[in-house]
Amino acid sequence: MEHQVRCAVLGLGRLGYYHAKNLVTSVPGAKLVCVGDPLKGRAEQVARELGIEKWSEDPYEVLEDPGIDAVIIVTPTSTHGDMIIKAAENGKQIFVEKPLTLSLEESKAASEKVKETGVICQVGFMRRFDPAYADAKRRIDAGEIGKPIYYKGFTRDQGAPPAEFIKHSGGIFIDCSIHDYDIARYLLGAEITSVSGHGRILNNPFMEQYGDVDQALTYIEFDSGAAGDVEASRTSPYGHDIRAEVIGTEGSIFIGTLRHQHVTILSAKGSSFDIIPDFQTRFHEAYCLELQHFAECVRNGKTPIVTDIDATINLEVGIAATNSFRNGMPVQLDVKRAYTGM
């Protein structure tokens, strides 16, 4: 493909709008030509703001537009499966936010359609593109810490999402911890074989009606013999706190920092520094790089480093952790999955 990839962003909530802005400002291999959102007036508003000629209040209509090469799907997760299938049937290259869907059956059906039509499907596990995680991956693969034997990660959000989001999110293991499941698999180069999910409501009692929790822990085991634990929290009023450690037989790698800037204030009150305020600030570069990677894959016919197959595996782990939490028992996973060809 010689020209810029002609993209449409479908779904213009917080993250969809963010992707749209990044496509306009930070992805030279792509051109945003259309935006779509069913909320009356939203698509037109964003189109005018970003200088986009096409907009639609029917995202499905956009999937049939022959002037669009690729779609960035940031609609509610419950719509992902159907939109992926229709996009693939119309020959659109696909970038879709995580999770791929909320059920394994839907994810497998979407992946089958992607395979059948031969389109690209990249999923928004942006931590793989973050420079710190990418550097850690390079160093682990180079053997700098020996054999990786333990992953420890935590994701702490400033507060709980709105009730309407919680209701349709799939729960903390699928919505939040799934990022750690993905990056743990990626960094260790191993598949998760067992999960034990635990959780409690510590600060947000409204979550009980949705069967969700605001503090969760997943103990994980890998087919390489490694193990790990993943913490997820909806109570981090001091800022957006995402860090990880990989322990190896010859050393450890620490990933992430709380610091927003490399500035420390010393005074009679003590020492202080600004903390990263939100996920867009922490992962801005990663969000741009993942879209640049997607555009490069579309232009050159390459397979993305994170695909619908990865997303289906991550979802399977998230569902298993959720079931383990609810049933109080560990859940075993079969790494020889038919849908992966492993």
From Swiss-Prot:
Observed phenotype of the null mutant: Inactivation of this gene abolishes growth on SI as the sole carbon source, but does not affect growth on MI or glucose.
Gene3D superfamilies assigned to the protein according to its UniProt record, in alphabetical order: Dihydrodipicolinate Reductase, domain 2, NAD(P)-binding Rossmann-like Domain
Induction statement: Induced by either myo-inositol (MI) or SI; SI is approximately three times more efficient than MI.
Molecular function GO terms recorded: NAD+ binding; NADH binding; oxidoreductase activity, acting on the CH-OH group of donors, NAD or NADP as acceptor
Highest taxon in the source lineage: Bacteria
Family recorded in the similarity comment: Belongs to the Gfo/Idh/MocA family.
Identification of the protein by name: scyllo-inositol 2-dehydrogenase (NAD(+))
Native species: Bacillus subtilis (strain 168)
